[in-house]
Each structure stands twice: as structure tokens, then as C-alpha cells.
Amino acid sequence: MTNNLIAKAAIDRRLAEIVSPVIADLGYELVRIRLMSGKSTTLQIMADKPDGGIEVDDCAAISNAVSATLDVEDPILDAYTLEVSSPGIDRPLTRLKDFEMFEGYEAKIETTEMIDGRRRFRGELAGIEGNEVLINLDQNGETVTIGLEFDWLSDAKLVLTDDLIKEMLRQRKAAGVLNEDQFDEIVEEAPETGATTMARDGSEEETK
């Protein structure tokens, strides 16, 4: 069953059931899916490799495979644009394992119901315990660790910090995506947040 952080609306969950196996067969994981309606309809898919480091070519491969599957299944009534992107540096946290993977980094979390008079929490992730997400909060100058049931969460994402940027770049360097010169230059310039996107027509975009 797809959780509400990956796919919030009923149509998103239906689409997730269709595209998740396609993405998995290519060796990737679905991070988030949203069908956005307005003047035009856009299907936004966020995917990643199990160990991170998804690139433009990966987005293109996912876009082509998903597009072919959706053409057959035809779950979307209106004409739409398909956008496939990486999660970006200040990525959403949609799976329980994400909170364990990014332990030690700052995050913002929202819950569906009020907890001790609040729904929004910001602090350092402290891993997981069973089905609970642990987060360190600053309360009157003291650090307090609380546990939030994963099923209570309505939204969660990393906060963009220098430490997070450097860690993501180190991972990309270790994966061979960045060479030594690129790594040093990017760290000094402190890049803006964003994710490479591959639209259905094959054009590249930058999401902010």
C-alpha cells in the first residue's frame, strides 16, 4: 500500500500503483507522485536510486518507460505533461527509511492532527524506532527527543543547510558523478536548491 506522503490523493495512489513497478524494474524507487491540475495538467514524478544519485539520463529513461505504460493504462482523462525529477538536495521525506537515512540532518515535519498543541515541528532527525520518527527539538534551550508515528505525518522535508549540501556533494563525488575540480568549485559556491527535471517532450527543466 502506498502511503500518503508518496501519493496524497486517490488518483495519485492509483497512479503510484501503476508506475511504481515500472520504475522499480528500471532499478529506481518512487519518492513522490502528484497529479497537478490547473490551466494545464502535469504529472510530477520524483524518483531516486536506492543509494541516491539520479541524473538526467535516469530521468529520461524513467520518463520514456512511464509514458509508454500510461499510454496503455490511460488513467488520466485530460491531456497532460509528464515531469520526472530527482528529489533535490532539500528533498521530501516520504518513506520511513528516509528518516533513518538522513539522521543528524535538520528537517521540517507536519502532522495531520494536533500534537501537544502543534502540527509543525522543526529539528534534527534522530532516526527511527519501530514505526516512529524521532526528532530532536529545542525547547527552552534544552534538546528534547520526541517520537512521531509515521502514519501521523502529512508532510516532511529536509532543511537546506551547508552540512547537507556538502554531504550530498560528497555522495555524488563518491559515486563518480562529480570530479575533484567540480566538487571543490561547487562547495565554494554553495549551489542553490533544485532538481533536474525531464519533461515528457524530452526537454530539461530546473525546479526550484
UniProtKB/Swiss-Prot annotation:
Pfam families to which the protein is assigned, alphabetical: DUF150_C, RimP_N
Location (main, coarse): cytoplasm
Listed InterPro entries: Ribosome_maturation_RimP, RimP_C, RimP_C_sf, RimP_N, RimP_N_sf
Organism domain of life: Bacteria
Region (Disordered): 189-208
Keywords tagged on the record: Cytoplasm, Ribosome biogenesis
Cytoplasm keyword on record: yes
GO biological process: ribosomal small subunit assembly; translation
Alphabetized HAMAP family for the sequence: RimP
Biological function: Required for maturation of 30S ribosomal subunits.
Protein name: Ribosome maturation factor RimP
Organism the protein comes from: Ruegeria pomeroyi (strain ATCC 700808 / DSM 15171 / DSS-3)
Gene for this chain: rimP
